[in-house]
Amino acid sequence: MMPRMTGKADLNTLVHKLHPLEIKVLKNCAMDEILSTSLLISRLGFKEGHANQAFSWLRAKRIIEEHQREQMRSFELTPCGYAAASDGTAEERMLTFLSSPPSLTAIADAAEHLHPRPPLCNGLSLPELAHALTLAPKDVGSAFGILAQEGILRMDGEKRIHIVSPHVSDRMSLTRTLLQRAAARVASPSEASDTPPGTLFESELSDDERRVMERIAKKRGASDSLFKVSVRERVTFTFTPTARAVQEALHTAGLTGNEIGALTVECLKSGAWKTQHLRRYNVHIPPARIIPGRSNAYADFLEHIKDRLVALGFQEFDGPLVETDFWNADALFMPQFHPARDIHDVYYLKHPTHAPTIPEPFLSRVAATHERGADSGSLGWRYSFDRDFTRRLLLRSQGTALSARHLPTAHIPGKYFGIARCFRHDQVDATHLADFYQTEGIVLGTDVNVCTLLGMLKILATEIAGAQEVRYVGGYFPFTEPSIELHALHPALGWFELGGAGLLRPEVTDPLGVHVPVMAWGLGVDRMALLALGISDVRELFSPDIESVRLRV
């Protein structure tokens, strides 16, 4: 806000900083006038945006102040309204057509479009009327419903339309009046108005017209209505006591608002700069803030993980978000109807509920392993495997489902990874989300062992996530043995789990045709990002605050 002026020096400085738009307002408006956008448009030829900008600047300098603010409700003609104003509404066209029908040939052509031999004496059906009037069937049906309610039309037992009373209802008459008044403003819009052409203000309507307008105007989805409801705010201003002194100073300085604001090639060639005043510029005003484009930090981190793992010789794999219970759990030796299944509280699909099939021979092998261990050297879980249960569809709850899907086609030796979006019914907090990313990886080979796995986990935690301290904790996962939890120290959150890892059990690998050691891990990428990006709440990764992206170094 501008400081209050204390002398002629301040006043002289102010007037030379005024924009040409502000100067024109001060030079062409009386001190006792009520200032409005429409006034500046009509008197000064301003566009609406220029008028609003001039008011904003003058108000900031305390030269004008707000006088009145009011909500103005108006009704603007839609494209549908334009057509109705010139060609008639659907009700008008139907009533005119039925009251003074065209030649029998035209009616017969309309009827022949739908029926070979229409009984013309009983009138036309709604589809025949729609064809004859070239209107959409829904518009004809809606128009008939209104006219039938008003007792003007009726439908007989053969669904043919007849006129009961050929009079025009008060509603139709008022609708025609409103359309004609609005159309007149489309043809000759007022130059002093800052509202769109074809607009009627609620304040100028009678009570009866207002009731009709409520039926034919919509605020949203107005494409099929005659009018669109618009609510605009109208603000008027008055000059402050300061304005008179500023106006006098403008006169003394000889400023007109036509000063040159930019030295163009034409201005230099013509020599106009020699005779016209140049507008003063305040070089102390800070420049406009430049906001360069920036990529999202979390998206960059996801790409960083991929780049590092590819550089280590890994191949990326992917899979569907909607998964079957088979690949999400059964193929990982997680028993059906067992507490171990509660590790992942999943989202099941409402429709469709089941996949058509599960590929063989993997279904039979996995079922046999669950029931009796098969050739894995295990006793299995000793229950009857439910082949219908395993086809249930759900949102993938763990990235390890990708590993299970790709084990049958994996090369030996081979290294694979994926960035998987997973979904669980978790309580959202600083380290948990209901949908999150995991980085999933497997390494197959005869020389794979726990030492290999620990080394890989350290690379993931320290070199990729940027953890300063890590530790390995024994854990339990139904599909690995041994099972290891990877923990990292966060500066604000303390120690927390990054994810789990281990060597896949034979009950997982054998049914899928793999007979060499396989190490696997599934780490929470969101938690890795807490360390890498220096934040303490995973919810910040998905924040709508664009300023946090703009200010990122």
From Swiss-Prot:
Broad class of where this protein is predominantly found: cytoplasm
Reactions performed catalytically: tRNA(Phe) + L-phenylalanine + ATP = L-phenylalanyl-tRNA(Phe) + AMP + diphosphate + H(+)
Cofactor note: Binds 2 magnesium ions per tetramer.
Assigned EC number: 6.1.1.20
Subcellular localization(s) per the UniProt record: Cytoplasm
Pfam families: tRNA-synt_2d (PF01409)
Residues annotated to bind L-phenylalanine: T400, F479
Subunit description: Tetramer of two alpha and two beta subunits.
PROSITE patterns: AA_TRNA_LIGASE_II (PS50862)
Origin species: Treponema pallidum (strain Nichols)
Protein name in UniProt: Phenylalanine--tRNA ligase alpha subunit
Single GO MF annotation: magnesium ion binding
Cross-referenced InterPro entries: aa-tRNA-synth_II, aa-tRNA-synth_II/BPL/LPL, Phe-tRNA-synth_IIc_asu, Phe_tRNA_ligase_alpha_bac/arc, Phenylalanyl-tRNA_Synthase
Endpoints of the signal sequence: none
GO biological processes: phenylalanyl-tRNA aminoacylation
Keywords: Aminoacyl-tRNA synthetase, ATP-binding, Cytoplasm, Ligase, Magnesium, Metal-binding, Nucleotide-binding, Protein biosynthesis
The family this protein is said to belong to: Belongs to the class-II aminoacyl-tRNA synthetase family. Phe-tRNA synthetase alpha subunit type 2 subfamily.
Cofactor annotation: Mg(2+)
A GO CC term attached to the entry: cytoplasm
Residue positions binding Mg(2+): E481
